[in-house]
Every structure is written in structure tokens, then in C-alpha cells.
């Protein structure tokens, strides 16, 4: 028995939908055996329909339950997507899933010029494009031309613009090389020319002779030894002596047996033979540098003759007349 009063004025809290729900729940509980622990009232079926109805009514009036309109049937397809864990396919590639995480954060500037833009208008080539177009802007067909020589001459383009017609199947052309059999190609262009083979025996025998430097067949009158830095024995000494003029009656320095000058006093005996030696005393302006200037012949003395060397006039100097007073 229910403790709640059942008066005629009080409408019944049972509804057809609620009674059917309770009957289905009671039948399913009593007919189904489960291994999970269940409360005692659910096993013996001692649940009271009025209590179930009260719980259902209290659940409907719960403030935490979401409210929606009566005509809002909801989206079953959307609920199904969220409830079922299905795999995404190619159709879901463009599905909006919100902001991507760590994807495309680096900005990529648009390249210039872009292919979608009008390049003729951008670079001022619209007039030239209209002149060489096959169809004019008004729809008329432009006169066909074989070449663009007239436009090239008018623009003043440098170079030779006439094509040079050649036989495409000529020897060593691209088509000729492509048509060569494999064995012929290996024989002509591969065998004996591989870099891994190195030098042949014949080349190695001639290599030492080819790398040796010599005079060769240059004529003697055109050969210049100074280019190679070669100086024969005594040549450099003679050139140095002939290049410097000497004072009158100045003795020449004596040379050794090999053409080298005699070492001076106070200099080391062992010197480099390939190094040229100074043959003339270095000019100086000390007290000893004027030695010998006053020891020359006096023009006023009665010498009788003169060699004439160092004199600006040519020929021998005349003897001076000596007056004898009686």
C-alpha cells in the first residue's frame, strides 16, 4: 500500500508512458540474471511504482537538466558522430576541427610576379603582344607571318637572328648519337677513355720526356738566355765591366782563374760563387773619398805630350812652346 493519499481530486501521477516504462523495467530486472551486486529491492521486485513515479518527476524538475523546446528534436546524426568512435575518411579531409596545433606557423610571402597576374600589363608589353597576336582585339585574324624579322629589326635587337638549318641526322648530332648501337658506343666513346684506367704504358713512357724542359728548336739568334736566368761563365762579369766607364789611367781589377774577382782584405774567404761581386769601389763622401784628385798631371807642367783621354776636344794636344830668354 502506498502512503500517499489517493483522492478523486488528485490526478493520477501515472501516465501511459510512465506505466509502460515501469513495467518494462520490472520485467527486465526479474528476467535477467547478472553477476554484479544489485540492491535487495531490485531482486525481489519490492520497488514501489509510486516511488518510481516520484523519482521520475523529481528528475524532470531537476535544475541541472538541460531544457529545450518541444519542437527541437535534436540532431541524431551529430550525436551519432560523437557517440560512435568511427574512422575518418577522405570525405572528412576538409572538416572544420578548429585551430591546428603547430601547423603552418611560418608565413610564406606570395611570390612576385604571380602567374595569375597579367604579366604583359605589368611589364608594359601589351602593345607588343597585340602586334604579334594571331587574333586582333576586334576579333579579326591577324596576317600570318613566317618570321618576326621585321619586329626584330624595328626593336634593334643585336645578333644574327636567321636560323642555321642543318641535317638533324649528321654525324655527332644528338639524334645520331642516340641511334648508335650499344657495342659501337662502347667502342668509340667508352672503351679506353674511362678515367679509372689511368695512363697507358705508351703514355707513361713518353711522359718523362714530355715534362722535361729544354731549349728545343728555337734559332740561336732568337734565343735569349736572360729569360731563363742562365748566365755563362764570365758573361756577367764582362757585361758589368763594359757597362761602367772607367777614369783615365785607372787600372782594372784583376780577376781570378774562374772569372771571379779577387776577394778584398777583411772579407771572408768562403763566399757564394753564384753571387755576383762588386767590381768598383762604392762611392762615398768621407775624407778618403777625395784621394787621388790632386795627384793628376798638371796642365801647366812641361810634360811634352798628353794622351788626350778625358778631354772634350778630339785629337792630340799640341805641345806648348817654351820661350828661352838669351
UniProtKB/Swiss-Prot annotation:
Biased composition (Polar residues): 41-56
Residue span of region Disordered: 1-84, 217-326
Record's subcellular location: Nucleus
A GO CC term assigned to this protein in UniProt: mediator complex
Biased composition (Low complexity): 1-35
Pfam families: Rox3
Protein's name in the database: Mediator of RNA polymerase II transcription subunit 19
Gene expressing this chain: ROX3
Amino acid at each position: 500500500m502506498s502512503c500517499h493519499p489517493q483522492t478523486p481530486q488528485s490526478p493520477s501521477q501515472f501516465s501511459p508512458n510512465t506505466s509502460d516504462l515501469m513495467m518494462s523495467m520490472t520485467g527486465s530486472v526479474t528476467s535477467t540474471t547478472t553477476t554484479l551486486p544489485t540492491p535487495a529491492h531490485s531482486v525481489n521486485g519490492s520497488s514501489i511504482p509510486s516511488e518510481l513515479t516520484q523519482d521520475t518527476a523529481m528528475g524532470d524538475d531537476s535544475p541541472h537538466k538541460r531544457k529545450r523546446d518541444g519542437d527541437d528534436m535534436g540532431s541524431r546524426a551529430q550525436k551519432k558522430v560523437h557517440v560512435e568512435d568511427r574512422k575518418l575518411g577522405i570525405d572528412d579531409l576538409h572538416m572544420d576541427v578548429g585551430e591546428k596545433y603547430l601547423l603552418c606557423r611560418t608565413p610564406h610571402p606570395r611570390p612576385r610576379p604571380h602567374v595569375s597576374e597579367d604579366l604583359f600589363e605589368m611589364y608594359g608589353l601589351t602593345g607588343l603582344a597585340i602586334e604579334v597576336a594571331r587574333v586582333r582585339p576586334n576579333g579579326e585574324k591577324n596576317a600570318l607571318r613566317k618570321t618576326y624579322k621585321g619586329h626584330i629589326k624595328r626593336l634593334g635587337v643585336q645578333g644574327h637572328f636567321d636560323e642555321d638549318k642543318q641535317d638533324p641526322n649528321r654525324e655527332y648530332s644528338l639524334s645520331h648519337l642516340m641511334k648508335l648501337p650499344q657495342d659501337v658506343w662502347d667502342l668509340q666513346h667508352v672503351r679506353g677513355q674511362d678515367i679509372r684506367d689511368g695512363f697507358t704504358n705508351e703514355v707513361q713512357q713518353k711522359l718523362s720526356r714530355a715534362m722535361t724542359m729544354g731549349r728545343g728548336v728555337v734559332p740561336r739568334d732568337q734565343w735569349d738566355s736572360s729569360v731563363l736566368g742562365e748566365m755563362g761563365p764570365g758573361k756577367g762579369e764582362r757585361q758589368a765591366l763594359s757597362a761602367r766607364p772607367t777614369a783615365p789611367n785607372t787600372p782594372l781589377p784583376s780577376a781570378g782563374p774562374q772569372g771571379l774577382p779577387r776577394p778584398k782584405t777583411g772579407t771572408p774567404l768562403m763566399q757564394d760563387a753564384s753571387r755576383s761581386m762588386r767590381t768598383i769601389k762604392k762611392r762615398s763622401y768621407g775624407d778618403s773619398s777625395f784621394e787621388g784628385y790632386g795627384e793628376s798631371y798638371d796642365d801647366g807642367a812641361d810634360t811634352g805630350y798628353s794622351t788626350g783621354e778625358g778631354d772634350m776636344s778630339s785629337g792630340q794636344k799640341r805641345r806648348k812652346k817654351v820661350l828661352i830668354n838669351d
